[in-house]
Amino acid sequence: MSLFHSNTAFTASTLDIEAEDIQYFLSLMYGAIVVTLLIFQRLFSFFRVRTYILLTCSLSILILLGISLTRDPFLIGILRVIEGIFCVLEGACFLPLLMMQIKHTKSRTIAYFFLYTFMLTGSTLTTSLLKESIMDYGWQDMIHVVLYWHLIVIAIALLLLNNNRLGKKFPLYQLDLASCLFLLISLSCGAYVLIYGRKYYWFECSTITINFALFLIFGSLFIIKQRMVKRPLFHFEILRYQNVIFGVILFFLFYIIRSCLNNVYTVMATVWKWPWHYIVDVQYINVLGTILGVGSSGFLLLRDVSPKYIFGFGFLILGTSCFLFVPTFYPDTTIWAIGLPLFIQGIGQGWLFTPLVIYILTGVESHHAGNAGLMGTTVRFWGTNVGFALIQNASYTLNQKHYIQLEQTLNTNNPLTINYWNTLMEKYTGIYGDQIAGRIASKSISGTLSQQASLISNMEIFTYLGILGMLITGLIFLFGSAKTLFMRLRMPYL
């Protein structure tokens, strides 16, 4: 049910605010999730299960009520941080509960497959559930719908769960809350730099410079404090494990490639002018692919297939989907044309996500598993924000470049240009007069050029991402051979 917290897309469309603002609100929440995972196990062990769920759900309802009653962006930002804390407290407890119910030698792996299937498909599912409320009523009513779902969770907890503990009770003392605060400030400031950097011309703006400095200062304070305390929240020793390093790198690259999917939905809305409720339905093509990908990689993982083949084929599928998107970026595309790459992209992300997590977790000693999982969550935080920043900057730069190129090709001696201009003038002259009609016609041509520039830019972006996917695939399959060759060449000098 914590997945219902994350959907702010329709709030953005109703309030007409910038994409950067929505991304930053999500990043505030996700940064709070990363920080709370440091102390989640202590909090979960302190309470009995039913009491814990009732408490977190009740507080989540109060937070949602607060969000529905305010329009102050600063206050909403604070509430999003608090919401992120209770989001993970509410959601993360279901993983150990699920593991206990699965009678299998690999219950943890199966439980993770369930969890990440919901995480990858949750935004589309929750969007569909909230669609009717936002269409017929408003964004406050949308939040109330989320609130009602939490009431259902409370009813389930009261009726079906007992009040036993899953393990030994740990008292809530010696919690290193100062380190949590340092990390939260560092993540929030770092996310601000990545998300708003292009908008404010990076370090030409004092706000960006200050946030970058705060990111470095509080990040350093967190690291220093963790090195000094006897019982650190995060053990940096896990960075010595090969699985963690490789898994983190692959996870980061996975999120860079995956971040381009938002561009597809943006083109659907701004260029092809598809209704947003129709775009929601189209996303189910991607959901079906994701479920198929999760099931396929899960079958291979339970059969102990080498991670090299799972990762290699996963990035091959992602790269192929990027190449298949390229020819769909035309003004007259159809759902049948865009459906295939959407489906294949879903297979790729579903195929890779859980195996990457399991690869990181199984590569460390059992007492470091929690920190390894936190590394994966942190990489998702940075991967999402870096991917957003990269795609935003690439889209902006390429759009400007292609717009200028297209504008330069307009020639008043070209019959096509003359006919198009005359058609627009005839359309608007009878309504507005010659002078206003000329302005509207110029604006219409500018809008058409912007749309064409956007389509060409996306062709270029997806081509580069497809090449990246293929390069990663090649490196995965060749890494073992290259490492062996390197060691052989190095042996005479050792």
Would you name each region that the model predicts?
Residues M1-A9, L26, L233-N399:
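12-transmembrane solute porter fold
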Residues L159-P171, Y192-I279:
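Membrane-helix boundary/linker segments in multi-pass transporters
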Residues D141-L159, S179-S188, I208-F215, Q405-L416, ...:
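Symmetry-related core transmembrane helices of the 12-TM Major Facilitator Superfamily/SLC fold
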Residues M1-G31, V35-L37, E90-G91, L261-Y265:
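Extracytoplasmic
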Residues D16, R48, L69-L75, K273, ...:
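Helix-breaking motifs and short loop linkers at transmembrane-helix boundaries and internal kinks
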Residues T384-S481, M487-L494:
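Hydrophobic transmembrane architecture of multi-pass small-molecule transporters
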Residues I39-Q41, S45-A178:
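Helix-loop-helix hairpins in multi-pass membrane proteins, especially solute transporters
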Residues L26-R42, V88-L95, Y284-S297:
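Central cavity-lining transmembrane alpha-helices of secondary-active solute carriers
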